[in-house]
Amino acid sequence: MSAGLNLAQLQAVHYTDGPCLVLAGAGSGKTRVITHKIAHMIDAGLPAKRIAAITFTNKAAAEMRERAKGLIGRAAKDVLICTFHALGVRMMREDGKVLGLKAQFSILDADDVTSILKDAGGSSDAATARQWQWTISKWKNMGLNAEQAMAQVADDNERITATVMARYEERLAAYQSVDFDDLIGMPLKL
């Protein structure tokens, strides 16, 4: 089962006393370690539905799913293997009502975000909307809402952006929509 793993990789696979952080460069075998760890946990009696493996990209999730299937067969369908954003969507579909969202909320693409920001800011300039989006994204990734962002603005441009953010958030709530940053930030509030 653990063929092809070096000593450090085997230690990570067999470590069971809590979380295990695997740090390694590209092509070094992280996916192999994680999929073997999944197989080891299932062999040790942990139900597959209690295991989650979260990645950054859809490509990595698909690769991990295929490798897990190769090691554990049909049990792989019960392991949650997805991206951080997909996990956020799943959590928000299940419990988003706590945040005022219906289960069938919409996820905005980049063009939708730009359009709503232009409307919220009263501007027809896409470059201005992209600048607002960049700053709002930064604030959201810091865990700030519009009111909190306004409390820490450094200049008039940020003050305008915080005002646009407040209007943008109002529109998202009215449209029952979220952007990609919300898929990471909102589940943290659940």
Regions found by a protein language model. Name each.
Residues S2-D17, F180-L183:
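N-terminal pre-P-loop "Q-motif" helix
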Residues L10, K30-T31, T35, A76, ...:
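Low-complexity, intrinsically disordered short peptide segments enriched in small/polar/basic residues
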Residues D17-C20, A39-L188:
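A basic/glycine-biased coupling hinge at the interface between accessory DNA-binding modules
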Residues D17-H36:
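Walker A/P-loop
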